[in-house]
Amino acid sequence: MNVTLRGRTQHFRTVTFDAVKNEVVLIEQRLLPHEFKLVRTRDFRETAAAIRDMIVRGAPAIAATAAYGLAQGARAFRGKSLAAFAGHLRKVYEMIEAARPTAVDPVNAMNTVLAGMAQGEGAPVCDRLLTIRHAQSRQHVGAPVHGNDVSAQQALALAAAEEFANQSVRECEAIGKHGAKLIRNGSNMLTHCNAGWLACVDIGTATAPMYAAQAAGRKFHVFCDETRPRCQGASLTAWELAQQGVPHHVIADNAAGHLMQRGEIDLVITGSDRVLGRTGDVANKIGTYTKAVLAKRHGIPFYVAIPLSTIDWNLKSGFEIPIEVRDESEVLGAWGVGTGTAERGVRGGKRQFVRVANPTSSARNPAFDVTPAELVTGIITPLGIFKPQELWKRRRELA
C-alpha cells in the first residue's frame, strides 16, 4: 500500500527479500504509528526472532516472512551434501515454526516452499521434509529449475518464497472483491486488532473489503478497537486507515458493546490466525471471542477474512489450538510516546514503556482466543464467502 511520509508517497510491502544480501526486509511495526522504519534480518535466526518479538506480526505477514526465512536459511547453507542440507533445513524450519505457535500460516508457508523445492528432479530431501509437520502444503509452486544439487534447491526455495508472497497479495485482492459486497453506503463497521496490509504482504484481509469499497466510491466509517494489551488497533489499524483516508475512530475495547446496543455498528470484520477447516472455529487476537458474542447478542453480522493458508485442515476442535501466552509486562503497562505534558518523568517525543498496573501485581497474558463457528456469520476467502460449516465440504476446492 501507499505510505505518505513528509509529503512523499511511496508504495511499500510489509515484507520483501533482498536476494543480493540474503536478507529479509521488514517494516518495524512496534514503532508505528510514531516512527516508520525498515529493518533487515541477516539470517534465519534473526528472522525467527523478528516473528517472535513482533517486529512483524499478522498471520499472512509472518507466513511470508517464514517462507522467506526458510529460503534465507536454505541459501545460507554451504556445502554439497544433500543429507547435511536436509538437516540444516529441519533446524531452520523448527526454529521459525516455534516463533509464534498459534498461527498455522507460517507452517503452511514453509510447507509450500518445501513443495516448490520438491519440484526439482530427484529432490527426495524436500519430499521427506514435507512429511515432518502436521500442516500440508496447499499447492506446489516452483521455478523452472531442475536438479538435485544444493544450489538448485536453494534457487527453488527463493522462487517458491517469492511466489508465495505474490500469491498472498493476489488472495488479499480477491478477499477485497468478495468482501466489498458486504459494505453499503453509510455502513459503520467494527474491526479488532490489525488485519490490514501491515498484517499481510499488502492490502490486508479484514481491511481489503474496506479498501475495495472505498475504491468503488462507497462512504463508510470504521471503529477500531484499541486491542489491548499491544494496542494494534489503536496504533496500526488506525494508522493504516488514516494513511488511506478512511473515516474512523479508535474506541476502548470495552466500548464495542455499548455502540452495538445503541445501533451504531452494522458489521464486524476481523482477521484470523487459524481457522479450523473441520469445524469453522476461529483463533484470533484476544478479545475477538468477546466481540463475536456481543455481535450475536445484537444481531450484527460477524465475518472473518482469511487467505487460504490460514485454514488448518488437521485439528478437530478449537480447544486443540495452541494459545500463545506472552510476557506479563504487556498487560502491566504500555508503550507510547510522551507528549511532555503528562506526569513527571515522561519525556516529550521519546518512546518509552510506562507501568500502569499496581507495582506488586502480576498478570496473565493469553494472546489469542477461540471463537466457536456458531458465532461466525461467514468466512471471507479468496474464493468467496462461506459459512464456517461449509469449509470442510469445500475442502477439495479450498485446500
Where are these regions (language model features)?
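Positively charged, low-complexity intrinsically disordered leader regions
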Residues: 2-45
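PLP-dependent amino-acid enzyme catalytic core
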Residues: 25, 31, 37-47, 77-94, ...
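Short, glycine-rich nucleotide/cofactor-binding loops
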Residues: 38-44, 196-200, 277-284
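Short, hydrophobic/aliphatic alpha-helical segments
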Residues: 39-55, 87, 181-189, 273, ...
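N-terminal active-site beta-alpha-beta segment that forms phosphate/nucleotide-binding
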Residues: 53-118, 149-251
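Intrinsic disorder/low-complexity segments
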Residues: 119-152, 339-348
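Conserved phosphate- and dinucleotide-binding cores of soluble alpha/beta proteins
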Residues: 219-220, 225-399
